């Protein structure tokens, strides 16, 4: 029972961190679409239900597995929606009120390699300049007009995400 509670607590902590990261970036820095807002709400709602059900799973076995499924599916949908949001949303209608230094870069093609999938090409207006100015602690390797870019080593991806998230939260707190 003790190990189950520890595992549930770790799962909730990791899930909450992922949901916070997925929701905070487009909410504070981009225009959020209604569809994406609904997915974010479902992620947080399922996450809030997941914590008590993990603790009392011996009496709420079915409800526990139901909320876990809802939480995982909503989180996956949110991640997919985030990817589509960054790749398919028109560049002209993106507003970044906290980052006015972004400039038009027509050839900023970024390739992110995933462990279990082929490289995914993501185009974003000013993405190179954004990361170079906001992530000084990480050396980025860009190759414009290339179909494959070594953006970051796979084993440093969680550290990279954590540092970028903390930096954005710090900048946001200073601007409020």
Swiss-Prot record:
It comes from the Eukaryota. The keyword Mitochondrion does not apply. Keywords: Membrane, Transmembrane, Transmembrane helix. The chain crosses the membrane at residues 3-23, 27-47, 79-99, 107-127. This is Uncharacterized protein C56F8.15. Its main location: membrane. It is found in: Membrane. GO terms for cellular component: endoplasmic reticulum; membrane. It is a multi-pass membrane protein. The lineage of its organism: Eukaryota, Fungi, Dikarya, Ascomycota, Taphrinomycotina. The keyword Transmembrane applies.
